[in-house]
């Protein structure tokens, strides 16, 4: 008969011998700006590295969920169309929930492997594994492009007759006082009237 301590030691010895970190898992905040009719995710490479996932796999997921085309340019991602930080963040979080986080222990210490042509999420922290199912687009919360009181990073596309900088986000035309064409500015939306939005630099 083994005593409790010896049984515990034997059980611990059979646990996966992997290095994990107790540090809080933090997804980098997407750094976005608009360039013409495209949206640039400037720190895409950093996000993929943090998630420990193949950039091509992450990019394929994002373009599918956003319903657009895109490409990777160095360490940044370029999406056709205008998207907000909220839209990108929601989809990255959905990707993490499905393709990164272990459903048993809640840790990000996982790998994607194929077993008999089935994509499986294998956890190196607790040893659990589960098949990955394609997430439906309806599971991702899509928010309004901009909201009053929200802050956004924009690229100024033009200057209006009154000297205000003008940027486009989705269907909205955003006016930014004191901004010049080509500037990348962070603004707070003060008021929205129809498809027009009035902001101030922050």
Swiss-Prot record:
GO terms for molecular function: translation initiation factor activity. It comes from the Archaea. Gene3D superfamilies: 3.30.30.170, Nucleic acid-binding proteins. PANTHER family: EUKARYOTIC TRANSLATION INITIATION FACTOR (PTHR23001), EUKARYOTIC TRANSLATION INITIATION FACTOR 2 SUBUNIT 2 (PTHR23001:SF3). Belongs to the eIF-2-beta/eIF-5 family. Heterotrimer composed of an alpha, a beta and a gamma chain. This is Translation initiation factor 2 subunit beta. It comes from Methanosarcina acetivorans (strain ATCC 35395 / DSM 2834 / JCM 12185 / C2A). The gene is eif2b.
């Amino acid at each position: 008969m083994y005593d409790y301590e010896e049984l515990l030691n034997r059980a611990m010895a059979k646990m996966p011998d992997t290095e994990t970190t107790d540090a809080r898992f933090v997804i980098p905040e997407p750094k976005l700006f608009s360039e013409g009719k495209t949206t640039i995710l400037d720190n895409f490479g950093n996000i993929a590295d943090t998630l420990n996932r193949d950039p091509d796999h992450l990019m394929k997921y994002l373009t599918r969920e956003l319903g657009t085309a895109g490409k990777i340019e160095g360490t940044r991602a370029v999406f056709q169309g205008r998207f907000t930080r909220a839209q990108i963040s929601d989809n990255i979080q959905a990707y993490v929930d499905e393709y990164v986080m272990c459903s048993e222990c809640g840790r990000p210490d996982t790998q994607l492997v194929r077993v008999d042509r089935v994509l499986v999420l294998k956890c190196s922290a607790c040893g659990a594994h589960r098949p990955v199912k394609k997430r439906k687009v309806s599971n991702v919360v899509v928010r309004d492009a901009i909201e009053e009181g929200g802050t956004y990073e924009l690229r100024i596309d033009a200057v209006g007759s009154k000297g205000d900088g003008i940027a486009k986000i989705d269907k909205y035309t955003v006016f930014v006082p004191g901004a010049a064409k080509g500037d990348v500015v962070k603004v707070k939306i003060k008021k929205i009237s129809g498809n027009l939005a009035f902001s101030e630099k922050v």
